[in-house]
Amino acid sequence: MSSSPEAETMECGISSSKVHDSKTNTTYGIIHNSINGTDTTLFDTFPDSTDNAEVTGDVDDVKTESSPESQSEDLSPFGNDGNESPETVTDIDAVSAVRMQYNIVSSLSPGSEGYIYVCTKRGDNTKRKVIVKAVTGGKTLGSEIDILKKMSHRSIIRLVHAYRWKSTVCMVMPKYKCDLFTYIDIMGPLPLNQIITIERGLLGALAYIHEKGIIHRDVKTENIFLDKPENVVLGDFGAACKLDEHTDKPKCYGWSGTLETNSPELLALDPYCTKTDIWSAGLVLFEMSVKNITFFGKQVNGSGSQLRSIIRCLQVHPLEFPQNNSTNLCKHFKQYAIQLRHPYAIPQIIRKSGMTMDLEYAIAKMLTFDQEFRPSAQDILMLPLFTKEPADALYTITAAHM
């Protein structure tokens, strides 16, 4: 293969580069490990993949230890396949539970809710890799399992099986090539057609779960998985919650998610609704469009600090705050409002990013500070950005790409 590196970043002995094969017109992302001298190909041209489609099975109640079945859902897209001993990073009970039905290929970093493994099904001659999430010690995946059992959408991670062994509950999920965070890091900023395709899939997933009375509460690039831009799914429903009485009226559902990507109302511990996911999806759209720009600063020292950073970076006008002055946003943060632009005008941090007008308009609408005026996922999907296919978008050059 004749190739030439296009970009490279270094950190702790690990570097990444993007190379292009002129003979096959193929772009690859490669991880280089200078410590052990290994290279790992992250991406090819994303050929049609059937990894997700071929992981089959019915979704029932959580199986007991005597059942040969297990359920599936994707949580972690990309790991160091086979370079780590499972026992070095995990609990022996989790390993035992997983090995009842799966061969462990490698272990991924434990998450806040459990241990995560790359596995193959025992007796499966295809050796197709899946992700198994195991929770031990009395913790439960019941809410996440219950939510995913009711989901059926091409852009939502599919729960195939779940099973219990003693006190350990396991969820089994298709293994995708990468998460969106990794994809952007290697390939970004992305061409406009890919941005639109991925965000359209994300918004479709959000419109679907919101219609079913579910708030995800942790929408971020690390929780979006893909084999190719046309095959993207929203995963990790561990922070998701159900709407009370199936109404989208803002209510107090408690704090959850990630400080860097949470909406203003959630950060302020005000009542919130499905619109909190739209804010987070707006940050995803911005991150795909403009690589290596940190929206609200790198240091997050709590929700108050994050809110002040949001107000400063977006130059939030006093008239953009909620009309209800009894909200925590108004009582504690309106004093930091800035009158440097007209109310609801596109913030300079977006305007100066060199993106198309349709794209900056969509991001600005999704990052509306007051949730009452923030559009729904279905509203955003009706914008021209998503209803019209970009003309030759692969070759659209903006200031952000220069």
Swiss-Prot record:
It is found in: Host cytoplasm; Host nucleus. Phosphorylated by UL13 homolog; this phosphorylation regulates subsequent phosphorylation of UL31 and UL34 homologs by US3. Autophosphorylated. Pfam families: Pkinase. ATP binds at L108, S109, P110, G111, S112, E113, G114, Y115, I116, K129. Keywords: ATP-binding, Host cytoplasm, Host nucleus, Host-virus interaction, Kinase, Modulation of host cell apoptosis by virus, Modulation of host chromatin by virus, Nucleotide-binding, Serine/threonine-protein kinase, Transferase. SMART domains: S_TKc. It catalyses: L-seryl-[protein] + ATP = O-phospho-L-seryl-[protein] + ADP + H(+); L-threonyl-[protein] + ATP = O-phospho-L-threonyl-[protein] + ADP + H(+). Its EC number is 2.7.11.1. One of its GO terms (molecular function) is protein serine kinase activity. Residues 1-21, 46-88 are annotated as: Disordered. One of its GO terms (cellular component) is host cell cytoplasm. The keyword NADP does not apply. Multifunctional serine/threonine kinase that plays a role in several processes including egress of virus particles from the nucleus, modulation of the actin cytoskeleton and inhibition of apoptosis. Phosphorylates UL31 and UL34 homologs, two critical regulators of capsid budding from nucleus to endoplasmic reticulum, thereby facilitating virion egress. Modulates and redistributes host components of the nuclear envelope, including LMNA, emerin/EMD and the nuclear matrix protein MATR3. Phosphorylates envelope glycoprotein B (gB), probably to direct it to the cell surface. This is Protein kinase US3 homolog. It comes from Gallid herpesvirus 2 (strain Chicken/Md5/ATCC VR-987) (GaHV-2).
